[in-house]
Swiss-Prot record:
BP GO annotations: cytosine metabolic process; UMP salvage
SUBUNIT field: Homodimer.
Any one GO molecular-function label of the UniProt entry: cytosine deaminase activity
UniProt-listed CDD domains: nucleoside_deaminase
Catalysis performed (reactions): cytosine + H2O + H(+) = uracil + NH4(+)
A matching Pfam family: dCMP_cyt_deam_1
Protein name per Swiss-Prot or TrEMBL: Probable cytosine deaminase
Cofactors (names): Zn(2+)
Function comment: Catalyzes the hydrolytic deamination of cytosine to uracil or 5-methylcytosine to thymine. Is involved in the pyrimidine salvage pathway, which allows the cell to utilize cytosine for pyrimidine nucleotide synthesis.
GO cellular component entries: cytosol; nucleus
Keywords: Cytoplasm, Hydrolase, Metal-binding, Nucleus, Zinc
Length: 162
């Protein structure tokens, strides 16, 4: 758990990312979701996972970053909220986007416990804090938070109960 206390606003945005992950699951996708919020508290991007559509790079975070950077490059003051700790690929996308703050719900460690038997979501045994901690510019990594809520879209999914 992070030592940083989340504000009610941050918790509300994190819950919105978790809702996006549930929407992805409801659409037959893997249950991951994220939103990007600007410095004026506007949700400027929302994206769920699209990997089952055939493109393994279409994780929620890479989709959101890819879509927003087509129209906006000034993301330093934005926060990315994600239902689950980003993988190495998504952490790289966050770094390259210039986003300087990321908050996540479910930890990579707890995700691995859920997914390891399915073979659909092979784990990388490295967390986003280690990856983003090596960045050339500071990126605040906050989480895990409200894991009891963030895990709900995953319950039963990885053991075939979609």
């Amino acid at each position: 758990m992070s030592s940083t206390e989340l504000s009610e606003k941050d918790l509300a945005y994190l819950r919105e990312a978790i809702k996006v992950s549930q929407q992805a699951r409801d659409e037959g996708q893997h249950p991951f979701g994220c939103i990007i919020v600007d410095e004026n508290d506007n949700v400027i991007m929302s994206a769920g996972n699209r990997v089952p559509d055939g493109d393994v790079t279409q994780h929620a975070e890479t989709r959101a970053v890819g879509l927003i950077t087509k129209t906006r490059r000034d993301l330093e003051k934005c926060t990315l909220y994600t239902s689950t700790e980003p993988c190495a690929m998504c952490s790289g996308a966050i770094f390259w986007s210039g986003i300087r703050r990321m908050i996540f719900g479910l930890s990579n460690e707890n995700l691995i416990k859920l997914t390891q038997k399915s073979g659909e979501c092979p784990p990388l045994y490295i967390n986003s804090r280690d990856i983003l901690g090596a960045a050339s510019h500071p990126i605040e990594v906050v989480g895990p938070y409200i894991e009891d809520e963030a895990i709900i879209p995953h319950k039963g999914f990885w053991d075939g109960g979609r």
